[in-house]
Amino acid sequence: MNSFLFSALFFFWLLFCSCKASSAMGNSLPVESKFTFEEENDRIKYVVSSMQGWGEKMEDAHAAILNLDDTTSTSFFGVYDGHGGAEVALYCAKQFHIELCNHEDYHNDLINALDNVFLSMDENLQQSDAWRELVIPHDNGCMYFLKAGVCAKPFPQATYTGPAYEGSTACVVVIRGNQMIVGHVGDSRCVLSRQGGLAIDLSFDHKPCTRTESERERVQNAGGRSLGLRCEQVMGNYVVKEQWVLGDFGGGDFAFKKNKDLDREKQMLVCDPDILADDITDDMEFLVIASQGLWSCVDSADVVSYIHDRLSVEGAELRVICEEVVEFGLASGENTTVILVQFKPGAFQYQLVDPAGFGTAVSNIASTSAAPAGASDTSDEGVDDAATARPTVMGYDADSSTGSADATVDSDEVDPNATADSYNPRGHAEIVASHTDDEVYTSGSARVESGELAVPTPSANNTVADEVKVDAAVVAGGSTTAMAADEATVVSLLSTIVDNYYSINTSEEPARRLIPLPLSQPTTRFINININAENARMTYIVKRREYFLVKSSCRCGGRHQQREVTSGGAGVEHGSIGDVPPSIRRAGRWMEKGRRRGRRAGSKYAKKEEEEGASCHAGCRHFVPEIGPWSEATIPENPRLPNSDENDMDAGGEEAKQERHLVLAHELFLLSRPDLDDLANVALRSDALDAVKSDGMAPLFESLATAGVLLKPDDAAARRDARADRRGGPQARRE
């Protein structure tokens, strides 16, 4: 009897160990069957593919909707990576875009609407369990029997507490006109491919291992600990919950947000999204939106390079490529979902968008004499309705990891005035998720196109700020007034973009509007800057009441550099694409020293590296350092591009001409927004320089110098020598 009991116990112990071993990976064998769907219109083509892989169950969800409404030509793509269950991710996939459509700012301020929807989704999960009706099947006979028979007298309603340890990431892309908005929380990622297969991260993963000191302090104050990739909730000496969370999206995880003594933004996990906006240009090839299952195995550059080669070199179909990329995620042991969005050639001609928030697209504003040949108004660009005549709404069954349920919705059945509970925009929806961060980083981009700049003639009795500035109304009206020679065409720096499109807010209220600036590497926390003499660009980042300007114009041999945009650090984070010159490596060592020893020590090392001939760091005279309320006298009084003295304006050579045009645009923007002062370089765009057909700049510069905007050569030399003396004396002067 005892031997039989021992054998039985031993058998159950072996069975338990085998189950535990198999559950560690999810399944004994991966589920490699894929769900794939594709659709296209005259602007874009997308393919979505998802696979359970080694995951114990499918917890990813996604939404792909080619035409979100009937009036604005808006497309929506979202990936939601659930953890602790698929319910929160599935709810986001079914409801996020509906909440966005029903938001009051959807038509007038899409950026603000997207930002608010992230927060409202979290609140909906916390306050009511009505969301479960969207993800739990209604045709379950057992549930119906229990409700109708056994539970004829239902038990008293328990207090709703929300999903304690379930949550989801979110990475969504909204395309309207020729504008693209990316919002994300968590470790799902969106990557852009530019011409030639250049990978650009449009989102930055929110992970505890990348937390800043302020974030770690917030977690500790809320009663938790941030240990690498883990967040633990601690009570006394006991760890009552150990949750592997690779992100902070507040869609669920309310066990980490229940400290009643703290505000929402001070909880252990928060739900503040990163929002980025950018123009869609002809050099953009495709977007890759994927869950963490893909990015934990391969990096962004490898994925983009593979897709680019398969598309352009081998000519493979987008559907086949998407399924191949999904298989890369098998090694992660997790679910994998990938959405590929391909931009069709010539579909996105440049348009100015309603400054109120991506409302109605209008054609590029250019003066009548400087309008480029063949330019036309594309504001009424249509959408192929035939491709969406009978759209479908699809989603995973909550009880099945591979099954799907289909429903067809006729377009005439959609009530545009319906509420969020009843209005289901046409499109294709499924399962996926994300996590967040407590700091909002936003960035965006805008291009400056060719046209003539209207500059009123300055008066000797008036100041530059009062008189010498761009007349936005005249420019918008197409006036051809200019101070340059008749044959000269001047870069149009439409001040309406800065005045209306931005909201530069230095008050206590955080800035919510994005600043549309050209991005060479538009990520949210780190900016990879392409240092190229023929492609000088800059990026402006907003971080809660702090503003930073990063400008790439260095021509001292460096190819790429990565700058860390934080208010307390030394200001630079080393990173590279391709070959890195020794000067960059030395700068990287200086950066580490600067972070360890503080800003003052960093400045000392900057000076030391400069004396040794290093460049491409904050001490480099070819680089304008970041600009913000915290920065002090480290910024030149009048930052300029290298070799920008007015007495060099008549020098020959194509490179010198381009440099003169760049300086011209820099100075003209000073005229348009004198109140911005050091932010004068904000609206520069390299491709706008190509519109400057004539080199007859002398009359214009003479007029600007008379107005006191440009320094006279002697004054410029004196100021340059003064800066050199502060930097290091005669040696720096010779440099």
UniProtKB/Swiss-Prot annotation:
PROSITE patterns: PPM_1, PPM_2. It is an enzyme of class 3 (hydrolase). Mn(2+) 2 binds at D81, Q292, E334. Residues 392-424, 565-584, 631-653, 712-735 are annotated as: Disordered. Residues 1-26 form the signal peptide. Keywords: Hydrolase, Magnesium, Manganese, Metal-binding, Protein phosphatase, Signal. Its EC number is 3.1.3.16. Disulfide bonds: none annotated. GO terms for biological process: signal transduction. Mn(2+) 1 binds at D81, G82. The keyword DNA-binding does not apply. The keyword Magnesium applies. Its cofactor is Mg(2+); Mn(2+). This is Probable protein phosphatase 2C 17.
